[in-house]
Amino acid sequence: LETVIVDNIKCNNKNCIIICNKKNCIVFNCIFNYKIS
């Protein structure tokens, strides 16, 4: 299993979660989510 890093950040004054592994990062917020390669 790959290591998963979860970080809480601020996006537009709202809480966001970034979930990263060795291949990509996924950013979640209250309105939408998108993948960062």
From Swiss-Prot:
The protein, known as: Major envelope glycoprotein
Organism listed in the record: Bombyx mori nuclear polyhedrosis virus
Post-translational modifications: Palmitoylated.
Membrane topology: Single-pass membrane protein
Gene Ontology CC annotation, any one: membrane
Gene name for this UniProt entry: GP64
GO biological process: fusion of virus membrane with host endosome membrane; symbiont entry into host cell
Annotated compartments: Virion membrane; Host cell membrane
Its job: Envelope phosphoglycoprotein which mediates the fusion of viral and host endosomal membranes leading to virus entry into the host cell.
UniProt keyword annotations, A-Z: Fusion of virus membrane with host endosomal membrane, Fusion of virus membrane with host membrane, Glycoprotein, Host cell membrane, Host membrane, Lipoprotein, Membrane, Palmitate, Phosphoprotein, Transmembrane, Transmembrane helix, Viral envelope protein, Viral penetration into host cytoplasm, Virion, Virus entry into host cell
Entry superkingdom: Viruses
Annotated family: Belongs to the baculoviridae gp64 family.
